[in-house]
Each structure stands twice: as C-alpha cells, then as structure tokens.
C-alpha cells in the first residue's frame, strides 16, 4: 500500500515537473518572439532616420534645392546600382567615408545559418524598409546597403558573407517592392567595421546599415 502511494506521489511530481517545463519552454519561446518583434524597425522609424534634416531657407536657396559636392555626386553616380562583389577595397573605403555624415539606420537583420537567406523573424524589418524606400520623400535618392558581421570566423569568410547578405537585401527590395536597382548600392565590410569594438562578438555588430547618400538640404518654408 505504501509503495503504491509512493509510486503515485512520484508520478504526480513528475507530471507537475513536465507541465512546468512545458510552460517554461512556451514562455521562453514567447519571450524570444517578443524580443525579435522589439528589434524589428517600423516603417516610420526608418523613414525618419533616412530623411535628410530640413533646413531653413537662405538667400539663393529655393525650396527643395541643395548644394551637392561635385566630386561626391560624381562618385555616387559611378557606384549606382553596383553589387557588393564588384567594388574594390578602395571603393569600399570611399563609400565608408562618404556615408559618415549621411542619414542612416542600423537594422538588426538576421539570416539563416551560414546563409544569405533572410530569416523569417527579420522579414518585418526588411518589409518596413521596402515600404519606407517606396515613400515619395525618399524616392530618387541613392542608398547604400552595407552588410556587417561580428568577429567570429575568418576575415575572407566574413567578407564574402556580408557581401552576399547585402546583395540578398537588395534583391528582396527590387523583387518585392519594385525599388529601382540603380538606386541601391550594396557593400560588405565583414568584421572590419564593428559597431561595438569592445565586444567584437556582440550581436549589435551583426547588422545591415542603410544610408541615404544624397543628403539633400531640403529647405522648409
């Protein structure tokens, strides 16, 4: 009788433990999904980040006009529509210098393991990017789509992976949102430009940066 009671008691305890583990797993999955949602940028956030700051009218400056650096404009025209793998090391560095003071946003876009395929949890961010770049306020500008990795893995491997992933984002935007491919320049930097150099393996380093190269000084009325 006692043994039977002990067996039933043990069975009940195991059942409770199993239920607890299941609930914990479900809660963990739900929290992971919520965290992924929190990291996805909205269309509005992207639009605000990539829209050049409005500046007051000055003498000789009409609404919507801006003064572009001729050399900068020439370089932008040279790289328009280029794919990441077609860029030389010098061109990559020139792009990095060009975009320093331009409107930009870092998107935490994840990809399937060892792949350039966009993960399902990051699709909302890429779709929001597509809608933002389709907005009339941004149409006509040339954008840099730059892929970055963390410090894990070899230099050449990360360089290749970052290029393929940047090109994957461009392909998605062109095919799904009809963005003009000439308005998108893809570039990969591998592990060469860490966002958080103090923590080279940090998730923040694995990102896609989008930059509006035509930082137009749109004058406000």
Model feature map: region roles:
Residues 2, 19, 35-39:
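Accessory regions outside conserved functional cores
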Residues 2-17:
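Bacterial N-terminal signal peptides that target proteins for export
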Residues 15-26:
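Bacterial N-terminal signal peptides
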Residues 26-32:
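Sec/Tat signal peptide C-region and signal peptidase I cleavage site
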Residues 35-142, 215-221:
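Periplasmic peptidoglycan-binding/tethering modules of Gram-negative envelope proteins
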């Amino acid at each position: 009788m006692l043994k039977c009671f002990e067996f039933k008691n043990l069975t009940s305890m195991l059942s409770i433990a199993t239920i607890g583990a299941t609930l914990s797993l479900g809660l963990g999955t739900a929290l992971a999904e919520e965290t992924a949602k929190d990291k996805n940028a909205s269309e509005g956030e992207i639009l605000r980040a990539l829209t050049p700051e409005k500046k007051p009218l000055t003498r000789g400056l009409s609404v919507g006009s801006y003064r572009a650096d001729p050399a900068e404009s020439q370089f932008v025209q040279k790289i328009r529509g280029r794919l990441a793998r077609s860029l030389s090391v010098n061109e990559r560095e020139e792009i990095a210098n060009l975009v320093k003071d331009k409107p930009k946003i870092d998107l935490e876009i994840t990809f399937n393991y060892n792949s350039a395929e966009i993960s399902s949890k990051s699709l909302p961010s890429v779709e929001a990017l597509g809608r933002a770049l389709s907005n009339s306020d941004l149409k006509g500008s040339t954008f840099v789509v730059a892929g970055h990795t963390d410090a894990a893995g070899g230099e050449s491997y990360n360089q290749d992976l970052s290029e393929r992933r940047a090109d994957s984002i461009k392909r998605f935007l062109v095919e799904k949102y009809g963005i003009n491919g000439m308005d998108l320049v893809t570039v990969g930097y591998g592990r060469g430009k860490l966002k958080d150099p103090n923590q080279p393996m940090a998730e923040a380093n694995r990102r896609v940066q989008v930059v509006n190269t035509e930082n137009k000084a749109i004058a406000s009325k």
